[in-house]
Amino acid sequence: MSDIVIDASCVLSFLLNQDGSENIVSIVGMNKLVAPSCLPFEIGNAISKLIKRKIISVYEGVSVFHEFARIPIRLIEPDIPNSIVIAGEADSYAYDCYYLNIASQMLLPLFTYDDKMKKTAEKRGIKCL
């Protein structure tokens, strides 16, 4: 059993039972999940977007967030200055680079459905699942 850095795209796909959610379960398996401490805020924001677009109801959104809260994910404070450097070099957002920072510093693989983040990670020598 090892640790995996998981991003919001994978967590949300799993929570909403979207295409590929079975893939998430098979990749995660018995591994321990790690993410930057901003993950709950990202999940909350993504849920609110779904509510605003009338894709889910407020009640469903709250239920999804409660489901998220039950997932055992170790939240870690990212090195924000280093993440800003990565963002500048990669022409990316700091939020995405928090995941890259943690994966790089902890020498862990990254699990993301975000193609741009995956390309940036691979360019930086981070293994992606």
Model regions and ranges:
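Active-site neighborhoods of divalent-metal-dependent phosphate/nucleic-acid chemistry enzymes
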Residues: R70-K116
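Short, well-structured N-terminal submotif of metal-dependent ribonuclease cores
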Residues: M1-C38, L50-V62
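Structured helix-beta-strand junction loops
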Residues: M30-N31, I71, M106, R124
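Active-site-proximal, substrate-binding regions of enzyme catalytic domains
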Residues: G44-P72, I76-I80
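Acidic, PIN/NYN-like endoribonuclease modules and their adjacent C-terminal/linker elements
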Residues: M1-D3, P36, L100-L129
